[in-house]
Amino acid sequence: MSLRPLHDRVIVKRIESETTTASGIVIPDNAAEKPDQGVVLAVGPGKKNDKGELSVLSVKVGDRVLFGKYSGQTVKVNGDELLVMKEDDLFAVVEK
């Protein structure tokens, strides 16, 4: 099974954040209150603006993005947990 997002939705695979520093210090979950990261797996075609024109999304497949801990809806596809969310739920694209 595969997913094709509609409108301004994106499908993101969460990247687990590091829980140990380079020096070996373990970071407890409650101390790691920072945005989650993920990789965009699929993007919808966009959504129509007030003029009826299609506004394409700012993110593309392969982008690494930041989003809130409770953003999106979790779905399980072929054993993987993926997130379906609106582009507005994304905070930023991580530039290399």
UniProtKB/Swiss-Prot annotation:
User: Which ranges does the record mark as transmembrane?
Assistant: none
Q: GO CC annotations? A: cytoplasm
Answer yes or no on keyword Iron.
no
**Which superkingdom does the taxonomy of this entry point to?**
Bacteria
Keywords of the record: Chaperone, Cytoplasm
Which processes are annotated in GO (biological process)?
A: chaperone cofactor-dependent protein refolding
Where is it localised? Answer: Cytoplasm
Under InterPro entries, the record lists: Chaperonin_GroES (IPR020818), Chaperonin_GroES_sf (IPR037124), Chaprnonin_Cpn10_CS (IPR018369), GroES-like_sf (IPR011032)
Molecular function per GO: ATP binding; metal ion binding; protein folding chaperone; protein-folding chaperone binding; unfolded protein binding
Q: Does the keyword section mention Chaperone? A: yes
Q: Which PROSITE patterns match?
A: CHAPERONINS_CPN10
Provide the family line: Belongs to the GroES chaperonin family.
Q: What does this protein do?
A: Together with the chaperonin GroEL, plays an essential role in assisting protein folding. The GroEL-GroES system forms a nano-cage that allows encapsulation of the non-native substrate proteins and provides a physical environment optimized to promote and accelerate protein folding. GroES binds to the apical surface of the GroEL ring, thereby capping the opening of the GroEL channel.
Can you state the subunit structure given in the record? Answer: Heptamer of 7 subunits arranged in a ring. Interacts with the chaperonin GroEL.
UniProt protein name:
Co-chaperonin GroES
Q: Which organism is it from?
A: Paracidovorax citrulli (strain AAC00-1)
